[in-house]
Amino acid sequence: MEKELNHPPINFGKTGALIINLGTPDSTSWFDIRKYLKEFLSDRRVIEVNPFVWQIILNVFILNFRPSKTAKAYKEIWMKDENISPLLYYTQEQAKKLSNSFSEQNLIIDYAMRYGNPSIKSKIKKLHEKGCENLIILPLYPQYSAATTATVCDEVYRTLMKMRWQPSIKIIPHYES
């Protein structure tokens, strides 16, 4: 079969493993904290109350007052030299160490955050671009909970529904510590 001109090379047969943590704001700024809190607290798996009432409470009260208090707490733990939250830093390190452990195999290991950046959507797109046909999704929560593991699954499937790509998927819902 003749290769079509101007067609990009296609890489097949790879497996992408995506380790996913809860999330963190991009910085300790009021705006970034507010953005993170809005995404997190708008998740119906996290806050299981009447969505109409909750959105009023969230947008009128919580998102106007809570970011200042939360920013103060983040500033205490923020890794200033790296300009990164500890959760993001250690999640990156986990992904690097896992990647080094499996470097000889046809496995690409990456990380994402359920809320904030890097997003599940951006990382799934990246794994697709690298030619992954299989996805292993590992939420970094040792026990299953709808507010943690299930919301990761929701976001993975929402992302895939919008793509013209359907890899084989293995989700690890819990693991022993």
Where are these regions (language model features)?
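Active-site-proximal alpha-helix that buttresses catalytic centers in soluble enzyme cores
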Residues: 1-177
